[in-house]
């Protein structure tokens, strides 16, 4: 892989934990983000800002979002931190299937089916959720 194509070169920490802000922007640029709907989803959203992979998009790039957080204390902070009509905030525990599957949760929102980015940060269950996405 040439150094020009390495995404690590674009690492930039604005709100993310390990520079994902810059890497995500570069990926969106490479896929021509001007043609995207500008919607993202983050579950395991915590307080909505600290180590968020979507907050930079919401704050600085006019994205709309669905932010999902299961923990009541973190969700309370998220509610205080994110005060915009561009964001749908949900206090839900995402499950593999049934009423609280990601698919069913998102069906109840106005997010388009072809949203642009999903960020999953649920401490060890990320793989199992991705495996069950439809």
Label each residue range with its predicted role.
Residues 123:
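Short His-centered aromatic/hydrophobic patch
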């Amino acid at each position: 892989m040439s150094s020009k194509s390495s995404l690590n070169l674009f690492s930039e920490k604005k709100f993310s934990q390990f520079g994902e802000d810059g890497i995500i922007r570069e990926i969106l640029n490479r896929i021509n983000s001007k043609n995207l709907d500008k919607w993202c989803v983050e579950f395991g959203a915590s307080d909505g800002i600290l180590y968020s992979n979507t907050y930079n998009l919401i704050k600085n790039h006019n994205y709309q979002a669905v932010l999902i957080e299961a923990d009541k204390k973190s969700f309370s902070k998220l509610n205080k931190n994110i005060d915009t009509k561009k964001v749908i905030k949900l206090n839900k525990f995402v499950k593999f299937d049934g009423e609280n599957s990601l698919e069913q949760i998102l069906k109840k929102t106005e997010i388009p089916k072809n949203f642009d980015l999903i960020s999953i940060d649920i401490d060890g269950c990320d793989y199992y959720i991705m495996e069950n996405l439809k």
